[in-house]
């Protein structure tokens, strides 16, 4: 475990790799990761552990845990899904991640940060004009995950002071207002 959240991903992975290469009979055991997020590296360390031989991860919904928290289930699930080349399938139905996150948040009375990866309110919200235009042209320009894959209906194009014409036209279209080219 990285109980203090101190390790860098390279260090954590090296520890797992060392055990895999130097402990007799280690393949009869299941090495597990248990990382804390004191330096914001719990997910990266967990993934490094998995890449180097750990076959079990100890994670929590929303990263809830001691001090700065533990590795976030939703981050690990979606990171492994995005990096299919690793050949690791969790078997988890990711479409329930957002609803489970919100349920845990409500029951624990622990709000989820708006900018929390995967399940935060702003995880699929775009407020900058260039990002909005890019997402409206092709979601893949600025989103590596389809919101539907985590149980959301769609991305949010928020009208802000940083929005551009594309976002305004998009909003007007949603409202059924059609502008002529010169407007």
What are these regions (language model features)?
Residues 39-54:
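Catalytic cores of alpha/beta
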Residues 52-69:
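Glycine-rich phosphate-binding active-site loops on the catalytic face of alpha/beta enzymes
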Residues 78, 85-183:
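A mid-to-C-terminal "edge-of-domain" accessory segment
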Residues 1, 29-35, 57-59, 76:
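Hydrophobic faces of well-ordered beta-strands that scaffold small-molecule active sites
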Residues 4-20, 67-75:
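Active-site-adjacent beta->alpha loops and helix N-cap segments on the catalytic face
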Residues 13-33, 78-83:
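Alpha-helix-loop-beta-strand connector modules within alpha/beta enzyme cores
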Residues 2-7, 35-41, 61-65:
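Active-site-proximal loop/turn and secondary-structure-junction residues that shape catalytic pockets
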Residues 12, 42, 97:
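Aromatic/hydrophobic pocket-lining residues that form the small-molecule binding cavity
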């Amino acid at each position: 475990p990285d109980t203090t959240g101190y390790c860098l991903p390279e260090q954590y992975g090296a520890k797992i790799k060392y055990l895999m290469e130097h402990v007799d009979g280690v393949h009869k055991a299941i090495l597990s990761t248990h990382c804390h997020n004191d330096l914001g590296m719990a997910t990266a360390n967990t993934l490094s552990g998995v890449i180097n031989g750990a076959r079990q991860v100890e994670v929590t919904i929303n990263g809830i845990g001691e001090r700065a928290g533990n590795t976030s289930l939703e981050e690990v699930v979606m990171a492994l899904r995005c990096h299919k080349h690793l050949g690791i399938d969790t078997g988890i139905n990711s479409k329930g991640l957002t609803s489970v996150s919100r349920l845990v948040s409500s029951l624990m009375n622990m709000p989820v940060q708006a900018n929390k990866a995967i399940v935060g309110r702003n995880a699929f919200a775009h407020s900058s004009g260039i990002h909005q235009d890019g997402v409206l042209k092709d979601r893949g320009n600025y989103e590596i995950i389809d919101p539907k894959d985590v149980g959301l209906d769609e991305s949010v194009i928020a009208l802000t002071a940083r929005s551009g014409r594309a976002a305004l036209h998009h909003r007007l279209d949603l409202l059924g207002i059609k502008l002529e080219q010169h407007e």
